[in-house]
Design a protein with these regions (language model features):
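Membrane-proximal basic amphipathic "stem/tether" segments
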Residues: 1-38
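Charged/polar, solvent-exposed surface patches and flexible loops
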Residues: 11-15, 22, 54, 91-94, ...
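Conserved catalytic-core segment of nucleotide-activated headgroup transferases in glycan assembly
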Residues: 42-50, 176-177, 191-244
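Nucleotide donor/acceptor-binding cores
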Residues: 28-29, 116, 215-218
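Short, functional N-terminal and low-complexity linear motifs
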Residues: 15-19, 137-143, 209
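Active-site and donor-binding regions of nucleotide-sugar-utilizing enzymes
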Residues: 30-199
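Short secondary-structure junctions and interdomain/linker hinges
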Residues: 16, 23, 27, 99-103, ...
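Short, flexible hinge/linker loops that cap or flank conserved catalytic cores
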Residues: 25, 112, 157, 211-212
Length: 244
């Protein structure tokens, strides 16, 4: 409870800066990217970022991170990258016309993106209820849906301009999950999946085969779970753990 009070107190302090940003012109050639609360260089944001770097020279793609290891690694690869709370990181968040995230606005610096076109690329398909469709989620509480929405816009997670969808079958659910109009859902598919349709294949499989020769490689790809409580999802007992 105390940490939440501190968090919202900080949001109140930043409110003037949140609205002052609207007076600063955006640069449509600056696109800012981030992923997983700034801690990873991965997922849909990374693949779209790399695509922009390779095929859109007119766009200045900038990666924002909270992780110094990513900062060093990205710069070695020639990717323009800044720490979330560095002066340049803040400045480019303010100036960017387009912001791309893969989980939440905290993937970049959520305090300095007011007035930008914010696109949530998301990180999967809603096979289970997420966001506003999940009646047990705190986002459906009175405090979040009324107080946070109107007084703490920095923290509010349902003011994206667009979200992406993997297919038409998921688009309606993405709209209701993020409280958006259907027209704000872009059926683009996952940028991270484009590699499966590309002539240039990802080298990850080749590296695994080299590391584990004469082995059968099985991918285990579970869905994300909010609960921190360990759960045994293997409910059947007709398998041998040693063989696995």
């Amino acid at each position: 409870m105390g940490s939440n009070l501190i968090k919202y107190f900080i949001y109140l302090i930043f409110l003037p800066f949140w609205y002052v940003q609207l007076l600063i012109p955006k640069n449509k050639s600056i696109w800012v990217f981030g992923a997983w609360y700034g801690e990873r260089f991965s997922d849909n944001s990374m693949y779209l970022y790399k695509n922009i770097q390779d095929f859109c020279p007119e766009v200045r793609g900038i990666w924002i991170t909270s992780n110094k290891e990513i900062l060093v690694s990205n710069r070695k690869q020639g990717y323009e990258t800044y720490m979330k709370w560095s002066l340049k990181g803040i400045w480019f968040c303010v100036k960017a016309k387009y912001i791309f995230v893969t989980s939440r606005k905290q993937d970049v610096n959520e305090f300095f993106i007011n007035g930008a076109v914010i696109v949530n690329l998301w990180h999967g398909s809603p096979l289970k209820k997420i966001g506003a469709d999940d009646k047990y989620s705190k986002v459906n509480s009175f405090f979040y849906s009324k107080i946070v929405k109107n007084i703490f816009p920095i923290s509010y997670e349902f003011n994206y301009d667009f979200v992406t969808s993997n297919a038409a079958i998921f688009s309606d659910k993405m709209a209701t999950s993020f409280k958006l109009n259907r027209s704000q859902v872009l059926e683009t598919g996952c940028p991270r999946n484009d590699v499966f349709f590309s002539v240039t294949k990802d080298s990850y499989n080749a590296k695994l085969i080299e590391k584990f020769p004469n082995s059968t490689i099985v991918y285990y790809l579970p869905t994300f779970r909010n609960s921190a409580i360990p759960t045994n999802i293997f409910t059947q007992e007709d398998y041998d753990e040693d063989e696995l």
